Structures are given as C-alpha cells and as structure tokens.
Amino acid sequence: PMQIAREILTGTRLDLISAYFSPPFAMLRRIARMGRRGRVRIITAARSDNNATIAAARHTYARLLRNGVEMYEYRPQKLHTKLVIVDDVVHIGSSNFDFRSLYLNLEVMLRIEDRAFAEQMRGYFERELADSLQITPDLHRQRASWWRRLKWTLSYFLVTTVDYTVTRRLSFGPEG
C-alpha cells in the first residue's frame, strides 16, 4: 500500500477498480489532490454481499467529486476486480482499497511498470466503465438524503474503525 500511496502522491492519472473502497483519510486526501492536478477515475461496486461496504464507499464520494474525481458504480454483477493504474504503473492482485485489505489481510499486489501493459489495462478499465453508472455530483446529491448520509457515515465508521479494531484484536490479541 505504501508504494501505491507514493505513486498517487506524485502521479497525474489514476484508474482504480475496487469492490470495497473505504480507504483511510490520508489516502482520500492524496486521491483528492490527484483529482485536482490530473485525472482520477474510480469504479466501485453497486452490488455486494455486504451493503455496509457500498454505503462506506458512498461516504467518500462527496469529497472526491468536489475535487474532480470521476466516480462510477459497476452494475451488472458483483465486482471482484482489484486494479490500480497510476500513470504507467499497474498494480493488480487481491487487495481491495479498504482498511482490512491495506492493513490486516495478507494480500498480494503485483506491480508492473510498463507503458504498453498500462494501456492494455486501461482498455480493460474502459470496458468495465461502459458497464458502470457515473455518479455525478447531481446524482450523488439526489441520493444523499440526511438518512442515507447518516447510514453512509456509520458504515464508513463500521468498516474502517470497528471492523478493523475487532479483527486486529481477534487476530493479534489486545497488544497487537
């Protein structure tokens, strides 16, 4: 995760697909900054076996949209792809863009620095984008009733803090 964070800090183009998207605030800040200086497109899940993860992702949309990030939700079926393309570098593997994947689970992401491969993977990204609904600022505002915003905020707290803390303690003990 630190390599991806460094690349996002200095990069100008990010295409990201992740079913679970609830990164820490520091990563959200980096993505928002990149949205102001370059092009950022993120595809998250519209469907999941865990609705809290969708709500947690939606909690991040307003800030990212305000900073020029393009947000999409993949609609045809459950999303399982984990893909990050920063400029000419591709990261592909098992890690979602959430606390559990970034800090708890044993995940593998293959880093490939190759312009031609990055373009091939952007072709794949474009095909997934065609099956995704763009979440515009207007659409997000229409969806964001006070009740939904509350659910999104609580879900973000649940998946970034409660789930992380409980899982960490169960896995590593109280001192872990």
Predicted features and spans:
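PLD/PLD-like phosphodiesterase catalytic module centered on the HKD motif
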Residues: R13-L16, Y20-G176
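Leucine-rich repeat
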Residues: M2-Q3, L28
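Secondary-structure "cap/kink" motif recognition
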Residues: I4-R13
